[in-house]
C-alpha cells in the first residue's frame, strides 16, 4: 500500500481544491504550500530569503557526516561532550494528563481542505497528538469518522516523525499509513530507537551508556498486538555517530508482550563489515527474564584444557526457572550443568548439579550437586543445604579457578529450624559434613550434630530496663564416623568418641546507663553435662562416661564518655573519649576429662579483651581473674556521620595464671607450653585498633599487638585503601601473625603443636587509565610458603556501545595436605575472555570475571560489566 503513496501525496499537495456541483476537482499549482522565509529590515526595507531546510537522512546525496548529523537530529540526540558517550537522547514530548483523560486526539496544521468524502487533506507542520502517541509530518490525508469528531486513519508523507513517550520509541520515516482505531501503522524506509532499562552501575548510567537500541528498516510495521515487524534492517546500541557494530537481518520481529527481539537470516557486522553469519538470533529489549540461548562462554583451565559453554535459559514461570549449560572441555569431554531456582510464598531455593558422563582423562563418570533452600513463615525460619561431589579433584578440574570451591575440604550438609520473637530464640539443627579428600584424618573431621536443640529465653519487656534475666539451653548429640588415622610415626591419634552434651546457662545482668557512662555487672552459671560413648578402639580415652561441670562467671563492664564539639571550615565535628574497664572472674576447673567437640582457641585481638571466654564453643571455659583497661577515641563529622579517625588501645592484667588449655583425655598434652607459651604472663599484649581517613578517598586501618615482656610485635594487620568517585581502587594489605591459633587443627592440638605463624601481603587495584582503558589486578604472596597464593590481571576496553575484557589468573587450587590447611598446593593457570555488546548483554563468563574482581576490597559488581 505504501508504494506510490509519496507520489500521490505530492500530487495532492500540488493542487488547489475546490468543489464544483458536488464533484471534487484537483487543479495543479506550482506552489500551493508556502515555503518558510527569514526576513529582516535593511536600510528601511524588508530583506527576505528562503529559510534553510534541515537535511533529510534519506537524502542519498548526503555525506556520511551529514547523514549522521541528520539522524541525530531526527532521533533527538543531544550532544554533551562531558558524557562518556558524547550525549543523550531527549524525550521531550507534548504529553499531558488532560489529553490522556479526555481520550481525544489533538490535530493541528497550517493549511487544509476537505473533499466530499470526509477526507481532510492537511499540509504544513501537521501534528496528531494522542495520549501516548505523537505523529509529525509535512503532509497528511486524514480520514475522519462520520461526525468528524475522531480520526479513523491517516496517511502521512514528507519528514515524518513517530513518537511513543511511554516507551521512548522514536521513528523517522518518509511515509506512514496509520489506523487510529486499532493503533496499527506501517512505514516505508525508517530509522528508529527503542528504550530499555539500565543496571544501576557506573558504566551503564546515563553518562556512560545511552540506554537505547537504535536501528533501520526498509519497512517498519506495528501490528494490532503491539508487536513490531521490521524488514531488511539492523539494530545497534551506538549513538547516531557510532556504528561500531550492527546485527542485521532480513526479518526482525519485536514481541512487545515477551519483550524479545528475533533476528532471522542476518549478520554480525563490525564497522559495516560482516564478520559472522547469524541464521537466527534472539535478545531481550528490557531486563526481564525469558527463555532462550544465552551468550557462549570461553575459558581455559590448565587441568581440563579449553572450554566452550553454551547455556540455555528456561523461564518456566514467574517464580521458578532453569538454566542448562553444556560445556565442552578439550581434555575432558562434555559436562552438563543445571541450575533450578524456585520461589514460593514461604520458601525459596535452588538446585545446582553437574554431570560428566565420561571423563576422557579419568575414564569414568563424575558429578557434583548442591541443594539449598530457605523458608520463612512469620517467626519460623528454615534453612537446608546439602553438597555432594564424586571425587576430590572435581572442583579443581571443572571450577575454572573458583577459589571458594577449589579450596574446599568439607561438604556442608545442614538443616536448621528456628523460631524467634522478642523473648524466645529456639532452634533445631542437624549438621553433618562430607569429606572432599579421603586423606582427611578422623581427628581433623568436625563432629556432626545429630541433632542440636537450643532454647534461649530473656525477660526483656517484663523486667525493668536496668535488669535482664536470661537462660541459654543447648542440647547436642555429637557423632563422628571412623576415618583414616594420623600416619605420622609416633603421633597421638585424635579421638572419635561420640557423646551427648547438655549446656544450661542462667544469667542475671544489670544495665545502669547514663548519658555520661554505664555500669553493667552480670552473673552467669554455665552447667554442662556430658554422656560419653567411649570405644575400645579409641586412642584417646576418658576415665568417666558421665561428666558434669558447673562454673560461675562474674563480670563487670564499666565505661564513661567525654564528648567535645568543635567547628572549623570543613564542618562540625564531635570528638569522643571513652575509657573502659572490663573485669572477669571464673574459678579454675580441670576440664581435660571433656573431649573437644566444637572448641578451639581464638587469636588475640582488641575486641577479644571484652569477652569472658577466650575459647570458642562450649567445651572449655577458661579460669579468669583479670582486668581489661582500655581507652577509645574517635572523631565524627556531624554533617554526614562519617568517622574521620578512631583509635582503640588496651591491655589485660592477669591476677592468676591461665590453667585451662586444650588438653583432653589420658593423652594429656605432649607440649602444653608450646601451644600456649604465654599462660603465665602477668600482662597480655598491648592490643590496639586504628582507623583513619588520611585524606579524601584514602583510608588506613591497623590492628597491632605488642608484647611488653617479650618486647616484640606478634600480631599486626594493616590495610591502606584508596577509592575515588571514578571507581579507581588501590589496596595494600599486610598481616603478620606470630601465633595463629585460629589455624590449629584437631590433629595439631592432639600433638601439642605450636601455632604456625602467618605472613601474607596482598596488592589489588581497579584502575581506569582512560575513559576507555581499564586494568584490574590482585597479587597475594605467602611469606611462610615462599610462593604466590593467588594472582590475576585483567584488561578492559570500554567503548560507547561495546566492551571487551580478558583476565588471567594463577591460583593455588588445593591444599597440598588436607590435614594442614596452611600448606599451599600447586599453582594452576586460568584464562577468561568476555565480549559485550551494550544493550544486548555479554559473550563470555561474566560471572567468573566478576567473582575474581569481588576479591578486591571496594569493587562494586558491574563496574567491569555483568551483562545486561
Curated annotation (Swiss-Prot):
GO terms for biological process: Gram-negative-bacterium-type cell outer membrane assembly; lipopolysaccharide transport. Residues 1-24 form the signal peptide. The keyword S-adenosyl-L-methionine does not apply. Belongs to the LptD family. Together with LptE, is involved in the assembly of lipopolysaccharide (LPS) at the surface of the outer membrane. Component of the lipopolysaccharide transport and assembly complex. Interacts with LptE and LptA. This is LPS-assembly protein LptD. It comes from Francisella tularensis subsp. holarctica (strain LVS).
Amino acid at each position: 500500500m505504501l508504494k506510490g503513496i509519496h507520489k500521490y501525496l505530492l500530487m495532492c499537495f500540488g493542487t488547489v481544491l475546490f468543489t464544483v456541483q458536488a464533484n471534487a476537482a484537483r487543479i495543479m499549482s506550482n506552489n500551493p504550500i508556502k515555503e518558510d522565509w527569514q526576513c529582516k529590515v535593511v536600510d528601511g526595507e524588508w530583506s527576505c530569503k528562503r529559510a534553510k531546510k534541515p537535511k533529510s537522512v534519506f537524502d542519498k546525496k548526503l555525506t556520511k557526516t551529514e547523514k549522521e548529523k541528520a539522524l541525530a537530529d531526527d532521533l533527538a540526540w543531544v550532544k554533551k561532550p562531558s558524557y562518556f558517550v558524547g550525549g543523550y537522547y531527549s524525550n521531550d514530548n507534548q504529553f499531558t494528563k488532560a489529553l490522556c483523560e479526555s481520550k481525544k486526539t489533538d490535530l493541528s496544521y497550517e493549511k487544509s481542505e476537505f473533499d466530499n468524502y470526509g477526507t481532510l487533506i492537511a499540509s504544513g507542520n501537521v501534528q496528531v497528538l494522542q495520549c501516548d502517541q505523537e505523529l509529525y509530518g509535512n503532509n497528511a490525508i486524514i480520514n475522519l469518522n462520520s461526525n468528524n469528531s475522531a480520526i479513523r486513519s491517516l496517511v502521512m508523507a514528507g519528514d515524518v516523525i513517530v513518537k511513543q513517550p511511554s516507551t521512548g520509541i522514536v521513528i523517522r520515516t518518509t511515509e506512514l499509513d496509520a489506523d487510529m482505531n486499532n493503533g496499527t501503522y506501517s512505514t516505508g524506509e525508517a530509522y528508529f530507537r527503542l528504550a530499555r532499562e539500565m543496571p544501576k552501575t557506573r558504566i551503564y548510567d546515563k553518562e556512560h551508556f545511552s540506554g537505547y537500541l537504535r536501528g533501520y528498516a526498509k519497512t517498519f510495521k506495528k501490528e494490532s498486538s503491539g508487536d513490531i515487524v521490521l524488514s531488511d534492517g539492523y539494530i545497534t546500541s551506538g549513538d547516531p555517530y557510532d556504528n561500531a557494530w550492527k546485527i542485521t537481518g532480513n526479518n526482525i520481529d519485536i514481541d512487545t508482550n515477551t519483550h524479545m527481539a528475533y533476528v532471522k537470516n542476518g549478520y554480525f557486522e563490525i564497522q559495516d563489515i560482516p564478520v559472522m553469519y547469524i541464521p537466527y538470533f534472539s535478545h531481550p529489549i528490557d531486563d526481564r527474564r525469558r527463555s532462550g540461548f544465552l551468550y557462549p562462554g570461553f575459558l581455559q583451565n590448565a587441568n581440563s584444557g579449553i572450554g566452550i559453554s553454551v547455556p540455555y535459559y528456561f523461564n518456566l514461570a514467574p517464580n521458578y526457572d532453569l538454566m542448562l549449560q553444556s560445556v565442552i572441555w578439550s581434555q575432558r569431554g562434555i559436562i552438563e550443568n543445571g541450575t533450578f531456582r524456585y520461589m514460593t510464598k514461604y520458601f525459596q531455593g535452588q538446585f545446582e548439579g553437574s554431570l560428566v558422563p565420561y571423563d576422557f582423562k579419568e575414564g569414568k563418570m563424575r558429578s557434583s550437586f548442591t541443594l539449598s533452600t530457605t523458608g520463612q513463615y512469620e517467626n519460623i525460619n528454615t534453612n537446608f543445604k546439602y553438597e555432594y561431589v564424586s571425587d576430590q579433584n572435581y572442583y579443581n578440574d571443572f571450577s575454572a579457578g573458583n577459589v571458594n570451591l577449589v579450596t574446599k575440604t568439607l561438604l556442608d550438609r545442614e538443616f536448621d529450624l528456628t523460631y524467634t520473637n522478642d523473648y524466645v530464640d529456639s532452634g533445631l539443627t542437624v549438621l553433618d559434613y562430607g569429606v572432599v579428600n579421603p586423606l582427611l584424618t578422623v581427628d581433623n573431621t568436625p563432629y556432626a550434630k545429630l541433632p542440636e536443640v537450643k532454647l534461649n529465653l530473656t525477660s526483656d519487656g517484663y523486667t525493668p530496663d536496668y535488669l535482664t534475666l536470661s537462660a541459654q539451653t543447648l542440647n547436642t548429640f555429637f557423632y563422628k564416623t571412623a576415618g583414616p588415622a594420623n600416619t605420622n610415626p609416633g603421633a597421638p591419634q585424635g579421638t572419635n568418641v561420640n557423646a551427648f552434651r547438655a549446656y544450661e546457662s542462667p544469667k542475671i545482668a544489670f544495665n545502669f546507663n547514663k548519658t555520661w557512662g554505664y555500669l553493667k555487672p552480670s552473673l552467669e552459671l554455665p552447667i554442662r553435662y556430658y554422656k560419653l560413648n567411649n570405644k575400645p578402639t579409641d586412642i584417646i580415652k576418658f576415665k568417666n562416661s558421665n561428666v558434669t561441670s558447673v562454673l560461675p562467671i562474674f563480670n563487670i563492664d564499666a565505661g564513661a564518655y567525654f564528648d567535645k564539639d568543635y567547628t572549623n571550615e570543613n564542618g562540625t565535628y564531635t570528638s569522643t573519649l571513652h575509657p573502659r574497664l572490663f573485669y572477669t572472674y571464673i574459678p579454675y576447673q580441670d576440664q581435660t576429662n571433656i573431649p573437644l567437640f566444637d572448641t578451639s582457641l581464638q587469636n588475640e585481638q582488641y575486641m577479644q579483651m571484652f569477652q569472658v571466654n577466650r575459647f570458642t564453643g562450649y567445651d572449655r571455659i577458661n579460669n579468669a581473674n583479670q582486668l581489661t583497661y582500655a581507652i577509645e577515641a574517635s572523631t565524627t563529622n556531624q554533617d554526614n556521620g562519617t568517622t574521620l579517625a578512631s583509635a582503640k588501645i588496651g591491655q589485660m592484667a592477669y591476677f592468676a595464671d591461665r590453667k585451662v588449655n586444650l588438653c583432653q583425655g589420658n593423652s594429656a598434652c605432649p607440649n602444653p607450653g608450646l601451644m600456649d607459651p604465654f599462660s603465665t604472663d602477668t600482662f597480655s599484649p598491648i592490643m590496639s585498633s586504628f582507623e583513619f581517613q588520611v585524606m579524601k578517598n584514602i583510608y588506613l586501618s591497623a590492628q597491632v599487638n605488642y608484647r611488653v615482656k617479650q618486647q616484640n610485635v606478634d600480631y599486626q594487620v594493616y590495610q591502606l585503601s584508596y577509592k575515588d568517585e571514578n571507581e579507581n581502587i588501590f589496596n595494600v594489605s599486610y598481616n603478620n601473625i606470630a601465633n595463629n591459633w585460629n589455624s590449629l587443627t584437631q590433629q595439631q592440638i592432639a600433638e601439642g603443636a605450636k601455632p604456625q605463624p602467618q605472613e601474607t601481603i596482598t596488592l589489588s587495584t581497579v584502575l581506569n587509565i582512560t575513559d576507555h582503558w581499564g586494568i584490574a589486578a590482585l597479587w597475594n604472596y605467602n611469606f611462610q610458603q615462599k610462593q604466590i597464593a593467588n594472582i590475576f590481571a585483567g584488561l578492559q576496553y570500554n567503548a560507547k556501545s561495546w566492551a571487551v575484557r580478558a583476565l588471567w589468573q594463577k591460583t593455588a587450587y588445593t591444599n597440598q595436605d588436607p590435614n594442614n590447611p596452611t600448606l599451599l598446593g600447586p599453582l594452576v593457570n586460568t584464562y577468561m575472555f568476555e565480549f559485550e555488546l551494550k544493550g544486548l548483554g555479554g559473550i563470555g563468563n561474566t560471572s567468573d570475571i566478576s567473582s575474581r574482581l569481588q576479591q578486591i576490597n571496594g569493587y562494586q559488581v558491574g563496574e567491569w560489566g555483568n551483562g545486561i
